[in-house]
Regions:
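Sec-dependent, cleavable N-terminal signal peptides
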Residues: 1-16
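Low-complexity, intrinsically disordered tandem-repeat tracts enriched in small residues
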Residues: 9, 116, 138, 145, ...
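Right-handed parallel beta-helix/beta-spiral solenoid domain characteristic of secreted/periplasmic
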Residues: 20-28, 39-52, 63-106, 278
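Functionally critical loop-and-helix segments that line ligand-binding/catalytic clefts
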Residues: 20-24, 71, 228, 250-278
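Parallel beta-helix/beta-solenoid
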Residues: 37, 59-62, 67, 81, ...
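Extracellular beta-strand/beta-solenoid scaffold signature
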Residues: 51-56, 78-87, 103-110, 125-132, ...
Length: 278
């Protein structure tokens, strides 16, 4: 089986050894499904060329995936991939940490996943979304999301980090969200939808490149209430778009810096001071 119980004798890089004694079991090949609660760990790089489904499916509540800085790879499926790197739906308390995930349609895809935590991951070369999390009480922090885009022509938008529901998004770095294919594709560094009282703070987004009449958006909130957008830095080179966008005067913007957008911070945001647009 791909997911194996923890064993005493293992061969691993030194940097990962400290965490292995806490592992419920190991993920040694993919695709695989996790059906037992606990902490499931990688101890080597794994990859797959499947074009649909998921490399790792979380099928129960209270699961942690700890990759120990190893890679989950999906580049073999090509740019038309329909695969998620890690997937869960209607599962509580999922945690994804210390993973390097590349080459999927969506790197981390958690739907209706209340209390999910996504932290300390590196995602790159995913074609549609790097991280996508819906659910309330979620936390997305200290992730690096690079080189999102290059999907099939049918894609109409690309997001590095997408959320739906009340969430906290903090201390993430997003770089190179680029609409390489398609027509009039909009790109988003942080796309925050729905939820009440979401917090988006101390994030960085740079080099967001739409195509055609599509727009570039550093932080884009919609259909939500009372979002707090604080201390973020977003930058592009002369983009048609908005650095920070709030929905229907339902967001507070404070101490943010935007650079290179046609509109730095739109009028839907309450300007609570310290914001600068260049």
């Amino acid at each position: 089986m791909a997911a194996l119980p923890a064993q005493l004798a293992i061969s691993t890089p030194a940097h990962a050894v400290e965490t292995f004694h806490t592992c419920t079991g190991f993920i040694d090949s993919i695709p695989t499904t996790i059906s037992t609660q606990g902490t499931w760990c990688l101890r080597n790089n794994v990859s797959t060329s499947i074009t649909s489904g998921a490399a790792i499916t979380i099928a129960t509540n209270n699961v942690t995936i700890d990759c120990n800085d190893f890679k989950i790879g999906g580049l073999g499926a090509g740019v038309n991939t329909n695969t998620s790197g890690i997937y869960a739906s209607y599962k509580l308390n999922a945690t994804i940490r210390n993973c390097s995930i590349r080459g999927f349609r969506t790197g981390i895809n958690l739907g209706s996943a209340d209390a999910a935590v996504v932290q300390d991951n590196r995602l790159d070369q995913n074609t549609y979304r790097g991280i996508s999390v819906s659910g309330n009480g979620t936390l997305i922090q200290r992730n690096q999301v690079n080189d999102t885009g290059a999907g099939p022509a049918a894609i109409t938008e690309v997001s590095a980090i997408y959320t739906s529901g009340s969430t906290t998004v903090e201390d993430n770095i997003v770089q190179n969200v680029i609409a390489s294919n398609g027509t009039n594709v909009s790109v988003y560094g942080f796309q925050i939808t729905s939820g009440v009282g979401s917090s988006v703070s101390r994030n960085i987004a740079r080099n967001l490149v739409a195509n055609g009449t599509g727009g570039s958006y550093g932080i884009y909130t919609s259909n939500g209430l009372k979002a707090f957008i604080t201390g973020n830095r977003v930058a592009v080179t002369n983009a048609n778009g908005i650095g920070i966008r709030c929905n229907a005067s339902n967001g507070s913007a404070k101490d943010n810096i935007t650079w290179g957008f046609s509109t730095g911070i739109d009028s839907g945001c309450y300007n609570d001071g310290g914001n600068t647009s260049h």
